[in-house]
Swiss-Prot record:
The lineage of its organism: Eukaryota, Fungi, Dikarya, Ascomycota, Pezizomycotina. This is Mitogen-activated protein kinase HOG1. It comes from Beauveria bassiana (White muscardine disease fungus). GO terms for molecular function: ATP binding; MAP kinase activity; protein serine kinase activity. The TXY motif contains the threonine and tyrosine residues whose phosphorylation activates the MAP kinases. ATP binds at residues 26-34, 49. It catalyses: L-seryl-[protein] + ATP = O-phospho-L-seryl-[protein] + ADP + H(+); L-threonyl-[protein] + ATP = O-phospho-L-threonyl-[protein] + ADP + H(+). The modification Phosphothreonine is found at residue 171.
């Protein structure tokens, strides 16, 4: 059995295996507290995320199970990877991942980014999205704080807790407003991988300009700001709006002409403007894909078609429509954790597949 040690972080009990030392708080989210720690086994710094009360409700248990499954499945240089997972004696779940020094939000609020950094960061975002989308996964909450960066400018997309299957009937508001695609605001349904491209376009604009492109105060204001720059959506897009109230609201707005992005981004390259215009398109089906963006002239300095992999297999979403009690989710989670350790043990050369001592 692994030996566990306890520490108090922000009034929260962290109960982790003795493999990890020197806990330091990094950040607090709605669903978990993240600390940095030293992995005694690898001598590397890692991030340890405690999932708060994962078994308190079926919704939270399912969300935790989904995040675990995604972290296990997604293996790519530009996506955060799982290095350990365990359940403490108090039945809290801890995800251990790579630790990167900062995130794009912190970088953007500290100083302007030079062109080569913007290109390299955007390239890595699109390279990661190409892989994620090929696995049948939509991130849904892409924003600067979910994009981690280290001192070598290596970039990794994180926080897949909200990610969902590519489903033509997706529902609800999920992503942070500034980066939210219009089809999420307008229809509450029928959205797909293209929402991540819109979010990436907003992040691209923010890297170029140093401030959010569409800083809406609420949903109505958000949509209004978007139309001030991009004009009124075309009729064929407006006619896809499912909600009658939303449809009435959009039709009541004054008609606006699209403004040239060049007017707003006067110092940007023509190729940067062209790529942004292809990302920030009202009609999702006319938006550039991640794979197409990688081939765009703006990303040419980094583009390597032989080193932009896709997923070997699609993610299995068969659990996602299940309405199960907490105890069932708990059993499924235990099974996934055992499977993870058995696979890792096998990869380490432990023939019997037993879980290595923590």
């Amino acid at each position: 059995m692994a030996e566990f040690v306890r520490a108090q972080i922000f009034g929260t009990t962290f109960e982790i295996t003795s493999r990890y030392s020197d806990l330091q708080p990094v950040g607090m989210g709605a669903f978990g507290l993240v600390c940095s720690a030293r992995d005694q086994l690898t001598n590397q710094n890692v991030a340890v995320k405690k999932i708060m009360k994962p078994f308190s409700t079926p919704v939270l248990a399912k969300r935790t199970y989904r995040e675990l499954k995604l972290l296990k499945h997604l293996r790519h240089e530009n996506v955060i990877s799982l290095s350990d997972i365990f359940i403490s004696p108090l039945e809290d779940i801890y995800f251990v991942t790579e630790l990167l020094g900062t995130d794009l939000h912190r970088l953007l609020t500290s100083r302007p980014l030079e062109k080569q950094f913007i290109q390299y960061f955007l390239y890595q975002i699109m390279r990661g999205l190409k892989y994620v989308h090929s696995a049948g996964v939509v991130h849904r909450d892409l924003k600067p704080s979910n994009i981690l960066v280290n001192e070598n400018c290596d970039l990794k997309i994180c926080d897949f807790g909200l990610a969902r299957i590519q489903d033509p009937q997706m529902t609800g508001y999920v992503s942070t407003r500034y980066y939210r695609a219009p089809e999420i605001m307008l229809t509450w349904q029928k959205y797909d991988v293209e929402v991540d491209i819109w979010s990436a376009g907003c992040i691209f604009a923010e890297m170029l300009d140093g401030k959010p492109l569409f800083p809406g105060k609420d949903h109505v204001n958000q949509f209004s700001i978007i139309t001030e720059l991009l004009g009124t959506p075309p009729d064929d897009v407006i006619n896809t709006i499912a909600s009658e109230n939303t449809l009435r609201f959009v039709k009541s707005l004054p008609k606006r002409e699209r403004q040239p992005l060049r007017n707003k981004f006067r110092n940007a390259d023509d190729s940067a403007i062209d790529l942004m215009e292809r990302m920030l398109v009202f009609d999702p089906k006319k938006r550039i894909t991640a794979a197409e963006a990688l081939s765009h002239d703006y990303l040419a300095p980094y583009h390597d078609p032989t080193d932009e992999p896709v997923a070997e297999e699609k993610f299995d979403w068969s659990f996602n429509d299940a309405d199960l009690p907490v105890d069932t989710w708990k059993i499924m989670m235990y099974s996934e954790i055992l499977d993870y350790h058995n696979v890792e043990a096998g990869a380490s050369g432990l023939e019997d597949g037993s879980v290595p001592a923590q």
